[in-house]
Amino acid sequence: LEFNVCSSDLITRGTSREHFVRATLESLAYQTYDVLKAMEQELGEEINSMKVDGGASANNLLMQFQSDITGKSVIRPSVIETTGLGAAYLAGLATGYWKSKEKITENQSIDRQFDRQMPDNIVNNKLKGWKRAVRCAMVYADEE
């Protein structure tokens, strides 16, 4: 077991497995924030919303936190396992079952949209902590 000195002051005797689970979920949202910022910088324009899928998108806490941290609307479809669905749609297009991509789009529905609820000052403090943790981890990794 390796102990990272960057997080040693954040782990106490009161830290539970639930805290680790929450931190893991939140880290996904922070990483998404970093990727979105890089994409926006490369594109030269703002991304307003994200369409999500996959198993993690079923977690309402994660989706809300992701919207809070990124400031983007997070849109979850009714069917979250879209890999298989996409293959089925392509097969349907190839066989003529679906006449156009537009017909497929009409068939899709939104389960839920998450919009930012967290106040800016809290988001800014959380992002400051995330950036500090990333810098610390990078320094720690460089020392290895």
PLM feature segments, named:
Residues S8-E144:
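Glycine/Thr-rich phosphate-binding loops that ligate phosphate moieties of nucleotide
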Residues L1-S7:
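Short, small-residue-biased leader/transition segments that mark boundaries at the very start
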